[in-house]
Amino acid sequence: MSSLVTPINLDKINHSQSTVKDYILLMKPRVMSLVIFTGFVGIWLAPYSVHPFIAGIAVVCIALGAGSAGAINMWYDRDIDSLMKRTQKRPIVRGAIEPDEALSFGLITGFFAVFFMALCVNLLASFLLLFTIFYYICIYTIWLKRRSIQNIVIGGVSGALPPVIGYAAVSNTISLESIILFLIIFIWTPPHSWALALFCNDDYKNCKVPMMPAVKGNLYTKKQILIYSILLFIVSLMPFFIGMNNFIYLITSGILGLVFLYYSGSLFYDTPDNKQAKRFFAYSIFYLFFIFLLLSSTSTISLIS
């Protein structure tokens, strides 16, 4: 059953005093936490020595870069955020931060993130960070999100790059290992996002964002989730087969992947309240965190020293 969402008139908002918490929320802290963690794992797995201070600078720059992209995304999407139930409490929509302030904050934060990555770490990591911010804002947010059913698939490049940036921050190179880290997140993103779209379908229809369930229907979306889940299972085992991680990783990641497949299959038997989609979405977050925790704890290559 569709739930009516009352749109918020952005022109009639009574703007309040901004707080530090508002600016933290502007940077999408939940997304940022995943970016920081996967970026750190990329740093950890690079088979080179790096001073902890440099590693710390790299993590901070990755975090600020993600926050910058999140802030500019909220600035651009403030119109559709006002139409969606799950985004109506975002800082710009509720009047805690002016749109122009959010844009300025995002641009300045992004500039310093890229600048200090170049100054203190290396140019490759800085370029990758700049590319990630640009891709998320221009390719995903501005171009794809409102136009293409493949918005999440193609746009997922930006979300998959943090471990590559972290790896490059230490090694000053892009290797097979970092590409596999990229692929794990890249293939994980569509089923994760489409599960969210299944139980937020009314929101996306209301603001005319062409998410797959709204355009192709739930059954087609569930089939796509299953296909990507199978691909993810295969790719997640690759670190063992290239000698990147040990046998413990193979067994544990295999079990986690089978559970992921179970949840994706359970979507075909979901109830009208989308209980299975919500469970799958929650598990997908746990899955990615745990896979990257495994990648760092069962590595057979050098660590930070």
From Swiss-Prot:
It is found in: Cell inner membrane. It is a multi-pass membrane protein. Pathway: Porphyrin-containing compound metabolism; heme O biosynthesis; heme O from protoheme: step 1/1. CDD domains: PT_UbiA_Cox10 (cd13957). One of its GO terms (cellular component) is plasma membrane. GO terms for molecular function: protoheme IX farnesyltransferase activity. InterPro entries: Protohaem_IX_farnesylTrfase, UbiA_prenyltransferase, UbiA_prenylTrfase_CS, UbiA_sf. It comes from the Bacteria. The chain crosses the membrane at residues 31-51, 52-72, 102-119, 123-145, 151-171, 179-199, 225-245, 247-267, 284-304. Its main location: membrane. GO terms for biological process: heme O biosynthetic process. Keywords: Cell inner membrane, Cell membrane, Heme biosynthesis, Membrane, Transferase, Transmembrane, Transmembrane helix. Its EC number is 2.5.1.141. It catalyses: heme b + (2E,6E)-farnesyl diphosphate + H2O = Fe(II)-heme o + diphosphate. Converts heme B (protoheme IX) to heme O by substitution of the vinyl group on carbon 2 of heme B porphyrin ring with a hydroxyethyl farnesyl side group. PANTHER family: 4-HYDROXYBENZOATE SOLANESYLTRANSFERASE, PROTOHEME IX FARNESYLTRANSFERASE, MITOCHONDRIAL. Belongs to the UbiA prenyltransferase family. Protoheme IX farnesyltransferase subfamily. Carbon 2 of the heme B porphyrin ring is defined according to the Fischer nomenclature. This is Protoheme IX farnesyltransferase. The lineage of its organism: Bacteria, Pseudomonadati, Pseudomonadota, Alphaproteobacteria, Rickettsiales.
